Structures are given as structure tokens and as C-alpha cells.
């Protein structure tokens, strides 16, 4: 049931050669979530995001979608921001994403670009793979990371990480750097074009405790 909140395509390009794992049998508890899960869902509801809880699933190779939701839209100060290509994402990441989108993105767009954000385009969330060059699972392997590709404003302008991080107007470049800096304050790991070539077209936002901002 979609919660109006009163009451993936691909993910980050960590390891494009990594094989996708097939799901294995899993037990679910989505109808009777643990107390901490219920608390997180309640916190997410307070953001007035629209979301649907997702059934827990375990996959081979250590991948999983546990305590996840599907976000339909996020609340700004006056309306809702649409989302594209976003699969299951952990409740914790979704809650951080909701706060960042409203206070770090939409308000920055108003102040710097003179228009509100109508849509946030993503490259997805869950994807079962490792970080490139390592055997360590990516944050996407547990649906704990989101890749942000672009922002579409209410006046139709589209500001993308790929085209506008270096090639946009002065205002667009400033906007992207402000939202990147804001993400660093909310997410444990935030990676952008200045990190490496694999992130030249998106911002990688991960809800972990790493405190790593590049």
C-alpha cells in the first residue's frame, strides 16, 4: 500500500563486470517489522514522502534488500518531487535522501537557480555487485546507496552531473557543488566527479558511517 505519509535500474558504476546474483529463498517480516524498522518507517513518514515497504529478500553472494522501501516521490516545502529509476532502498537511506532532497537540493535550487526541483533523476539503488577492484560488496548490494544523475526544474531546465558539473553555467556548477556538499553532511559516503572517472556522471550517496566525502 502506497503511504501518502500522513498516516533500479543500475546503480553506481562500482564494478560493471561483476555478475548479477540470482535470488535465493528468503524469509520475510515486512508485515511485522522489527521495532527499529517501525521507528525508521515512522521517521520516513514524517518527511511526507510517498513510499511502499518492500518484502525482505536475501540473495546469493551476501546481497540483500532488507528493511527497504520504494519511494514514489519526496516532499519539498510546497509540493512533491518526482523520482526516476529508483528501486528498493533501505529505510535509513530513504530518510536521509528525503531530508537532503528537501533542504539540501530544492532550497538550493530556489536560491541559486531561481526555480524549484520538479524531478530527481537517478541511476538506481539496489544492484548486487562488488566495488571495482575489490571483493568488498558495494553499498548498492544491500540497497543502501543511491546514484543521482540529474535534477529537472519546474521551468523545464535539466541540470545533470555529467554535463553541468564542469560544463554548465556558473549557477549550475555552483548548485551541483552545493548539493554535493549538503549530501556530505547527511550521508556517510558521498562521491562525485572529483572522486574518479567512474563517478563523472552521478553523485553516489550511501547511508553508512564512513564519513567519506569526495
Label every model-predicted segment:
Residues 111-143:
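Active-site-adjacent substructure of cysteine-protease-like catalytic cores
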Residues 1-8:
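Bacterial N-terminal signal peptides
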Residues 15-21, 66, 72, 137, ...:
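Catalytic cores and adjacent binding grooves of peptidoglycan-active enzymes
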Residues 23-42:
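N-terminal low-complexity, Pro/Thr/Ser-rich intrinsically disordered segments
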Residues 36-120:
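Active-site acidic/histidine clusters and adjacent loop/turn architecture
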Residues 9-28:
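Bacterial Sec signal peptide processing site at the extreme N-terminus
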Residues 25-31, 87-96, 134-135, 161-170:
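Second-shell loop/turn segments in exported
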